[in-house]
Amino acid sequence: MSEMTIFWHDYETWGVDPRRDRAAQFAGIRTNLDLEAVGEPVMFYCKPTTDFLPHPDAVRITGITPQLTQQKGIIEAEFFGRIQEVFSVPGTCGAGYNSIRFDDEVTRFGFYRNFIDPYAREWQNGNNRWDILDLVRMTYALRPEGINWPTRQDDNDIEVASFRLEHLTEANGIEQAGAHDALVDVKATIDIARLIKKHQPKLYNYFFNLRIKSNVAPLLNTHVDLSERKVMLHISGMFPASQGCLSPILPLLVHPINKNEILCYDLRHDPSAMLAMSVDEIIDNLYKPRAERNENHQHIALKGIHINKSPAIAPISTLTDERAKHWSIDWQEIDTHRQKLVNDPTIIRKLEEMCSRKRESGECDADANLYGGFISNEDRKLCNQVLTSSPEKLSQWTPDFKSTRLQTLYPRYRARNWPETLSETEQQQWHAFCQARIVDGEYDCSLTADQFQQRLEELALEDLTEREQQSLNQLVNWVQGFL
């Protein structure tokens, strides 16, 4: 069995949507379990393509320009191929800061667009993934000693802890010159992990074990009757920082379709209103867009916990009386709310029916449709053939994919990576596609030309640094070169 290592990584991207925005830079450092570096750091850029516009805010923040990535980068197929290689080393735990919710999604969608299995590196050969953002939140909520906690003002003007990486490093004397450079952020993430491991080693090791879903599931005890289930603590960014990002929760139901999701109830909230609702009313309350909600909208404190996403779960015994008081937890009130749920004979049936109803989702372009279904074994074999074929062979071959998503992705894959192999007709089709996406906003466009221009005009009114202005000027020159 291979010795386990942690591959700490980070992306810089051209936007904030991992489904639709593209990667600009990737960096990573491999360590052993003692957080000592193993081997040399890796860092590379991805060449941009002409079917998307980099977001001006991304360029302003990172200072990475399309010209830089065009000059120093590699094509997207090679970019994600290299990333697959480092993640696929047996015994690798892929880790980062907010990586499960963002960076891992960038990886999955990048692999998918480039015919690489988007999930294999997460579980094959003893591999897994981890994310220390919730470790940081958990440390703050339960065992804050030994670490300096920076603060910020929340939306209600309340001073709360800030979990931004650059704020944590500054508060704890960790050098992070060049924040929003992928390699700098990776080094800072490792330093924060070392800090917690040093001051709260038991908590660090406990949370490290939660990267394995078979260690998480028993904590949520859904295998026993509802009346016997234990209240657990859950730490999540979905809970207010003013409450320590922490709430006591009661596990209710294993999602009947997605077995990795456990529906739980936040016991800070009285469940009476939810228990009185019909299934339709529960669905309406949960999924109605905020803009359509009226003053009669009743908050339903249901939360899905994904056992395969390294959730921060702990027994209530880990919360000292002092910390419980600090986070305004009234255990008598918590127990009253729990009893209401346990004593209701209909809630589990209602939730099962709610989960079984398939919600309609809008049209999704093939590039962003990774979660439109698993790839069949036959199509996966064809994907592997694509990966081992030369650009010249790809230009003379049209794989017989059963999946319409893959059929749509194939010509785009060739055009993005090897435009020189396109026929004249294919070049015209690619140009028309790019124009339709960027100018007309078709094909699930992330940022249209009009939106791009509007944001530039807004930024022109702000007090930009010389570096920011130079970066934006280069961005404009780049876009003018192909629009």
Predicted features by range, described:
Residues 209-292:
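Acidic catalytic cores of enzymes that act on phosphate-bearing nucleotides/polynucleotides
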Residues 21-26, 30-62, 85-201, 370-374, ...:
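Metal-dependent phosphoesterase core characteristic of DEDDh/y 3'-5' exonuclease domains
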Residues 270-483:
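Non-catalytic terminal regions of proteins
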Residues 73, 101, 183-186, 261, ...:
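Generic detection of long, well-ordered alpha-helical segments
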Residues 182-229:
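Charged, compositionally biased non-catalytic regions
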Residues 1-75, 85, 254-259, 263-298:
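Conserved RNase H-like, two-metal-ion catalytic cores of nucleic-acid enzymes
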